[in-house]
Amino acid sequence: MKTHLLVSIPCGRYYRRWLAFIGLLVAVAVQQVGAQPTDSRTEDVTFTSAGITLAGTMLIPRHPVAAVVLVHGSGQEKRMLGMAARLAGRGLAVLTYDKRGVGESGGVYAGPEVGTNNVDAANLDLLAADASAATNALAAHLPARQGPIGLLGFSQAGWVIPLAAIKNPTVGFMVLFSGPVVTAREQLRFQFFTNGNRRFWETHTEAEAREHLRHDPDRYQFADTDARSLLATLAIPGLWLFGGQDIQAPVRLSMEHLDTLKAQGKPYQYQLFPALGHDTASAQSNEPVEAAIRWIEAMPRLKKRK
């Protein structure tokens, strides 16, 4: 249904003021139109990885400045269309897909959410293969002379993304929201110690958390993965966005490990948002996502891998 705006045109000495008012409205409307997200095309796609078919959606601006594949955290996650639309609106080409065994993607989801199968090295490697295949699928749909292609992910992607970048030389950068830079075993020990207590840091110290992280018994037996050893083999730029109140990933230890890698010449950066928790990419604050976008926008158009 169309909405019609009825306007009464004044006469006499108010006519010029009315024209000025209309002119102001037109100027505001033009400004708002200019602020709309970059025109982009949306396409549902499928691609194969490790013998199964994954389903996703691409959002590709007319002139993308760079491109990213969105990589899930843990859980039965479908494609992340809200985040994809936000990034595409800033000129980034995006591919987001349903995790294997979820939504329209084939395969089997490895559960439980926190347990042996989910964090086992074999499953993380399989998820990394999916992210690598998604990178190739996105690259095949991009126009010529596009900017670099990277991986942008959340939480568990702290292990998946470095694994995928090692597999695929097309990956030119990585952005990680609350991605742990520790072993999967250390992360689980920390998460079990905090036990979901949102006020954990009001009653516990970093030293106490480190002690439990080092010595608490493991509840599960699985093949471990160390983010540090993976990152030590890469030379592509990376950005981590951490929340100071995180009770799922040991943030300060992760930052210390990144500082060590940076001292070794790795092109890694991180930002800490003291008031935020683990979900640094949520609508609770726009700052981490905006920081990530600005970092990508500032990246050289062609980034060589060493």
Can you annotate each of these PLM segments?
Residues 276-306:
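Catalytic active-site module of serine/aspartate enzymes centered on a nucleophile-bearing elbow/loop
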Residues 234, 240-242, 246:
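Short beta-strand/loop motif that positions the catalytic acidic residue
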Residues 65-73:
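Short beta-strand element of the alpha/beta-hydrolase
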Residues 36-61:
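N-terminal cap/lid segment of alpha/beta-hydrolase-fold proteins
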Residues 88-111:
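Conserved alpha/beta-hydrolase
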Residues 83, 236, 250-260:
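Short alpha-helix in the alpha/beta-hydrolase fold that links the catalytic acid
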Residues 117-141:
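Alpha/beta-hydrolase active-site loop
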Residues 167-211:
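Hydrolase active-site cap/lid region
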